[in-house]
């Protein structure tokens, strides 16, 4: 993404960035010999991610009272396939692909509000990434942090401390649904 932001690359969707990274890693570690079909299948593992245990049920509860919108750096086909595979009950998929900016760029959040015909102050960014929440907050969104202890794997400790600027802090999606009455 930094190469796109710096102008080294034109706008590039995440699937293509993932493929560039994969190709570079395979070359770096001398892991050749995969067919193009195998490389494509490996690169598309992102399309087949399993959901976190609280995601499907918690999002379904939120959906009973609110629109559940995915706002991601992932391209639309990746997010659509992920939702289908994991059973994620999103109402709408908004992608950095449609804004031609990646998250943490203010244009992504402004584009989301525009696509939903909602004023910024009626939008809430729900995420396990503080940087994403901070960027959305700077644009005018409300924020809800959902703690995800394994977000970066079992051997890393994520920063899950509550920050004063967060509007809501939840232990998981079910806790968030409880807090907002869903």
Model features per residue range: what roles?
Residues 18, 51, 105:
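Conserved donor sugar-nucleotide recognition element shared by glycan-biosynthetic enzymes
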Residues 11-14, 51, 125:
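Residue-level preference for long, well-ordered alpha-helices that form the structural scaffold
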Residues 1-40:
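A metal-dependent, Asp-based hydrolase signature
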Residues 60, 74-182:
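Asp-based, Mg2+/Mn2+-dependent phosphohydrolase catalytic module
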Residues 28-29, 65, 85, 115:
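Alpha-helical structural context
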Residues 9, 46, 99:
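Short histidine/acidic/glycine/proline-rich micro-motifs that form metal-
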Residues 34-85, 93-96:
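Substrate-recognition element of Asp-dependent hydrolases with the DxDx(T/V) motif
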């Amino acid at each position: 993404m930094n190469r796109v932001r710096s102008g080294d690359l034109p706008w590039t969707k995440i699937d293509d960035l993932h493929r560039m990274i994969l190709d570079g890693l395979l070359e770096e570690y001398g892991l050749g010999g995969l067919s193009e079909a195998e490389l494509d299948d490996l690169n598309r593992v992102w399309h087949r991610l399993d959901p976190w245990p609280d995601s499907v049920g918690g999002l379904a509860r939120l959906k009973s009272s609110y629109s559940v919108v995915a706002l991601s750096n992932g391209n639309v086909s990746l997010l659509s396939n992920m939702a289908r595979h994991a059973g994620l009950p999103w109402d709408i998929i908004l992608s950095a692909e449609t804004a031609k900016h990646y998250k943490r760029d203010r244009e992504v959040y402004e584009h989301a509000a525009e696509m939903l015909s909602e004023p910024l102050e009626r939008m809430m960014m729900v995420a396990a990434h503080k940087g994403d929440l901070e960027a959305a907050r700077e644009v005018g969104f409300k924020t809800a942090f959902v703690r995800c202890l394994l977000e970066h794997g079992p051997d890393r400790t994520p920063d899950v401390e509550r920050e004063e600027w967060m509007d809501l802090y939840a232990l998981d999606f079910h806790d968030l649904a409880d807090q907002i009455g869903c």
